Structures are given as C-alpha cells and as structure tokens.
Amino acid sequence: MDIPQADLDLLNEKDKNELRGFISNETQRQRVQGQTHALTDSCWKKCVTSPIKTNQLDKTEAVCMADCVERFLDVNLTIMAHVQKITRGGSK
C-alpha cells in the first residue's frame, strides 16, 4: 500500500499511528491468509490423491488432512519457541 508522502504529511501524529497500525494489521492478516492457503494446498496435494466422488473426504483423506495440519502447526510452534529462545539470548 503506497501512500504519497504529501498525503501522509497532512495527517497528525495520532492519525499516522492509527494508519501504521491498520497497515501492520492488514499485512499480518495477509501473511496468515497466505500461510493458510499454502497449508491447504500442500495438505490437499498430499492427502487427496483420488478423484472426488462425493462432497466429503473419505476417512483416510480426512485423517491425513487432520494429521497434516497438526504437523504443520506443531512445527510452526516449535520454530517460534526456538526463535523466541534465541532472541532472549539462549542458544539451546
């Protein structure tokens, strides 16, 4: 989102901070949405290997999708915990 500097200069500090917060929130929302789409695509390609015949996944596909999502979330939580530990000064 590019806003001309001349337009930004017209805003007071409160409005500038509010705009920065809005842009930050929208950027974060887009990242989460992008990760969700990537996860869905990855797990779908891994788990749904046969033609779709009904409006529901079969039991094997449903279990595979659930496991795939859980694994993704577990890995992300582990990585986030490790990064937080590193930023706090710990190396293990």
Swiss-Prot record:
Subcellular location field: Mitochondrion inner membrane
One cellular-component annotation, GO: mitochondrial inner membrane
Gene that specifies this protein: tim8
Signal peptide: none
Species lineage: Eukaryota, Fungi, Dikarya, Ascomycota, Pezizomycotina
Domain of life: Eukaryota
Protein name, per record: Mitochondrial import inner membrane translocase subunit tim8
Topology within the bilayer: Peripheral membrane protein
InterPro entries per record: Tim10-like (IPR004217), Tim10-like_dom_sf (IPR035427)
Alphabetical UniProt keywords: Chaperone, Disulfide bond, Membrane, Metal-binding, Mitochondrion, Mitochondrion inner membrane, Protein transport, Translocation, Transport, Zinc
Family: Belongs to the small Tim family.
Subunit and partners: Heterohexamer; composed of 3 copies of tim8 and 3 copies of tim13, named soluble 70 kDa complex. Associates with the TIM22 complex, whose core is composed of tim22 and tim54. Interacts with the transmembrane regions of multi-pass transmembrane proteins in transit.
